[in-house]
């Protein structure tokens, strides 16, 4: 199941770029982004049904966009209808057709689609939901722009609800490992000494992405993480007292995210070749 922005007629006229059927192409796009980037969610009808009927949990579905491939060699791009026969005679170009790309996830409140989260926020959502399978985290190392890429191979999340007086806190702990995938212009010269600082930057970036998603969901008053459902299962007495007001309480709860990802080795990174 997926949602697409825009007119239904435009979506129905979309063309597959690599597969024989558009439905197969959509399935492959979502699947690849789930497995290799953790920037998409896989939602079937059963999960939508559960999100609609289970208290303290909202529905999240893949969000697709229509776009025209920029590559001139794309099979769905249109050229002129025929070669020009003279300098002054030229057939008009046909309009370019469009296909789908993943653009994040659609957020529901009850049975209504209310907003979107982008791919980076979707990755934060997937990490907290313990559904991440792998992905790339770019960080800025001694620079204002992101110049080093960390690829995580495993990621595990543990969520614990804590009642501190009248304050409800959800403590999210993330753990995982991976390696450095790429660096720009050889910014890291001595991995043995700079690795601790690099791990710190990676964990800060992961925490930032997760917290941005939490803040967005709280602004929307949509508990896409199922924190309420978790509280219902682990501390039912507390849940019974606040269940009717959860949509108003959720934006006020505190969510702490702590990431502990380990850079196991430097992967394929190396110092750039120098021309002498």
Segments from the language model and where they lie:
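A glycine-rich, acidic short-motif signal
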Residues: 1-276
